[in-house]
Amino acid sequence: MKNAKWVALLLVFALCVGMLAGCGGAGDGRRIIRIGHNQNTEHPTHLGLEAFADFINEKLGDKYVVEVYPSELLGSQTEMVQLTQTGAIDIVVASNSIMETFSANYSLFNLPYLFSSAEAYHAAMDDPAVTDPIFLATEDAGFICVTWLDAGTRNFYTVDKPINAPEDLKGLKIRVQQSPTNVAMMDLLGGTATPMGFGDVYTALQSQIIDGAENNELALTSNGHGDVCKFYSYDMHQMIPDLVLCNWSFLESLSAEDRAVFDEGFKLINTVQRAEWTGAVEAAKEQALNQQGVNFLYPDTAPFQQAVMPLHESVLSGNTELQPIYDMIQAYNAQYAGATE
């Protein structure tokens, strides 16, 4: 783990030196576009980004070369977002959860039980009236969100204690993403929130620094968490999107013609990633069950939901601009009230 971090630091240092020296090109006059994310090369996110790279290289290959860096090679998600702010890298995929430190508007999508179903979630996230006030809120910070990616439903998983009710979380140290909303959620559920970067979770589980975590099913297999955690409980507390963030200065530097191609490419990331997602979840669950010995539990979600609902009022009262967006999401929840997950 230490070696991997040193490699990431050295690579980031090299990128920054290259930027300062004006060496952002490929040596043949083309502009290198660097994209960082924290998943492996088989993950739907990486497949979507590779499709984007192929698309841009095909359409604008005489001007740009797209390079995709998986598995936190350019640093943690937070570090990569900061590098995207400065332009050291151009595009990063990051969870909405960590974005609260850049704009409070992002806290809305971190609320537990914000969406009543996957169908309502997808419909709301595809509506610019819902997403634009949030995705464009970081323009002054140096970047905007150009599209969203499906990260499924987040659920609790633990090393050796099944979670069937909120009371089962009492006394357990649970890794959460690094956001105030997630910490507050765990406090309301009775667990002990332990914020940490995704790349540190496996070691923390293995060494029993934490008792469990919360994420979608792919974390069990793609990241090996199912080798350590043997109980996965479908409490379905969050549907938090991953975001494709792009440096604003880079976008502003594009000609209208090139920007149109990039916008089409951003839509392609979303299309490919979401098309791959459902099959990847099904495959991960089968692998976790049959090869890793993970037990899947289906608790009543109502007690979990009841425990965290005060968080909705807290976030909305602290940022009244979010209320109209929240109301639009509730309208989608009502529209898809009969939908299944």
Regions found by a protein language model. Name each.
Residues G24-E119, T138-E341:
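N-terminal secretory/targeting leader peptides
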Residues M1-L10:
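Bacterial N-terminal signal peptides that target proteins for export
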Residues A118-F135:
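A gly/proline- and charged-residue-enriched helix-loop-helix capping module
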Residues G18-G22:
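C-terminal motif of bacterial Sec signal peptides marking the signal peptidase cleavage site
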Residues F13-V17:
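Core hydrophobic alpha-helical transmembrane segments of single-pass membrane proteins
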Residues L10-L11, V130:
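Generic detector of short alpha-helix boundary/capping microenvironments
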Residues M1, P133-T138:
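Short, solvent-exposed secondary-structure boundary motifs
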